[in-house]
């Protein structure tokens, strides 16, 4: 993209959305997208369609950069962070938003490394054209608590006094100011180009800390925050009951629900959070109800939401009731032969947010191949008038992904390592990407196994390359499911594989026998 030259007064006229057709799409597709937006039907569009014109505000939106002082860690150093910042600088952003976990191990030197990277890319806190670029950062659990995650921090600083001197949680105010030149406050607010950003830090080892102080803050600033103009709220964990579902609270990635209660009175609020590391290619990463909530994913490494088909996937690694003895369960569970979906260090997610008078555009991309990973999200303004990202709306509009007409399911018998590294007999199912329907992307595949004895099993696997762009070589390639042979029913076996998208729409099945 070309640099955006912006006036020193930060006052820019709104360009009509039909001003030009992005080179990446046809004029027909462009006009169809514009018509859908005007009719209130659009919630996504090909990258760039609604970014034409000069925004009133643009900012980087990333989370979980996890700068690590551990040289053996794949997160070591600031290379990815600097690369991402450099791209955002080239876009002429007005600000950079980071929703926590700047430091990986809760050490002062890691926050200082992040600060040095910022100054390297934005010297004097200025962009390419000399305008100021604001820092809008909050802390996360790794900043506050990760000194106690494992032994690295204590082994790096074995002397108790030296350790205490480098424990970030004990020195938030002074280290924050020395690293970023900003005053630290548990909750605060910045105004950029007339738009307000509320920042709420993780400064206690408790997910219940955010709601009570936000309620007080909103009450104090109600008059300036009320109305149709959007404001942005930042915290590290997802507000409970927003992204990924109304009841989702898996393993502490959400707060206690009081933030949702506080923001419910402000339909113009847009919440940004991280913490889960879950891929922003998952369409459940944006939610609308009484306000709007967005997951920013993870710059350091990408993870995957496992709320669907809970005990049947995606890792297929744990038996019910075994959570207190995870290691033993990993070794004992016959499902352990299935692929393990650990964090992907080859995919680094981030977003670019552009605010116009009638819309907010969120461009999603990854910084390994420097490409978009999905359609842009388009939030109509004012947000109270239209909620295209409400889950019930999107479920009704969901289009099931489909396999190509010549697709075939391949079934082979082989051996594979289990989690104990023992070779075990397995059945391998291979199938092509279900990318035959434009705009319908597979998130996972539902696998049904029927035995000759009448027994049935259900398993699921994530689509290959689901964290990357749909046209990437990885995402366009085949997926597979590896099943431990001794977990399958006896007798002749029948297999059925159906592609599914994030909201549950399932395509037609590929079938086969063994």
Where are these regions (language model features)?
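Extracellular fibronectin type III
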Residues: 504-514
């Amino acid at each position: 993209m070309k640099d955006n030259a912006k006036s020193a007064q930060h006052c820019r006229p709104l360009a009509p959305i039909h001003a030009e057709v992005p080179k990446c799409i046809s004029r027909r597709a462009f006009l169809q997208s514009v018509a859908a937006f005007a009719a209130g039907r659009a919630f996504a569009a090909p990258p760039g369609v609604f970014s034409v014109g000069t925004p009133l505000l643009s900012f980087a939106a990333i989370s979980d950069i996890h700068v690590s002082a551990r040289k053996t860690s794949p997160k070591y150093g600031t290379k990815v962070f600097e690369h991402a910042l450099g791209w955002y600088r080239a876009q002429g952003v007005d600000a950079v938003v980071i929703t926590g976990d700047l430091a990986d191990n809760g050490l002062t030197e890691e926050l200082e490394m992040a600060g040095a990277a910022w100054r390297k890319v934005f010297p004097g806190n200025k962009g390419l054209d000399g305008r100021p670029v604001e820092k809008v950062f909050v802390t996360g659990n790794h900043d506050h608590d990760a000194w106690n995650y494992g032994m690295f921090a204590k082994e790096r600083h074995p002397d108790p006094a030296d350790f205490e001197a480098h424990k970030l949680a004990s020195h938030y105010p002074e280290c924050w100011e020395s690293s970023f030149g900003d005053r630290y406050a548990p909750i605060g607010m910045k105004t950029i180009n007339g738009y307000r950003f509320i920042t709420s830090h993780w400064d206690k080892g408790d997910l219940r800390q955010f709601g009570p102080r936000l309620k007080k803050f909103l009450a104090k600033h109600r008059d300036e925050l009320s109305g149709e103009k959007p404001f942005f709220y930042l915290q590290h964990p997802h507000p409970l009951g927003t992204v990924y579902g109304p009841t989702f609270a898996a393993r502490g990635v959400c707060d206690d629900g009081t933030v949702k209660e506080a923001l419910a009175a402000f339909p113009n609020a847009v919440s940004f959070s991280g913490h889960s590391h879950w891929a922003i290619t998952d369409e459940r990463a944006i939610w609308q109800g009484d306000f709007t909530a967005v997951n920013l994913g993870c710059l350091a490494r990408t993870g995957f939401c496992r709320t669907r088909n809970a005990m049947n996937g995606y890792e297929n690694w744990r038996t019910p009731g075994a959570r207190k003895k995870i290691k033993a369960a990993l070794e004992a569970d016959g499902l352990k032969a299935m692929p393990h979906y650990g964090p992907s260090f080859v995919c680094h997610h981030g977003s670019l947010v552009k605010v116009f008078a009638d819309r907010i555009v969120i461009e999603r991309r990854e910084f390994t191949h420097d490409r978009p990973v999905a359609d842009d999200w388009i939030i109509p303004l004012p947000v109270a008038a239209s909620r295209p990202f409400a889950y019930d709306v999107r479920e009704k509009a969901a289009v099931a992904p489909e396999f190509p007409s010549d697709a075939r399911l391949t079934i082979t018998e082989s051996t594979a390592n289990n989690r104990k590294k023992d070779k075990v007999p397995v059945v391998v199912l291979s199938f092509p990407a279900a990318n035959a329907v434009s705009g319908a992307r597979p998130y996972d595949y539902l696998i049904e196994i029927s035995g000759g004895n009448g027994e049935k099993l259900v398993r699921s696997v994530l689509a290959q390359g689901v964290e990357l762009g749909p046209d990437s070589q990885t995402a366009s390639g085949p997926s597979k499911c590896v099943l431990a042979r001794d977990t399958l029913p006896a007798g002749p076996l029948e297999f059925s594989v159906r592609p599914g998208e994030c909201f549950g729409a399932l395509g037609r099945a590929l079938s086969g026998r063994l």
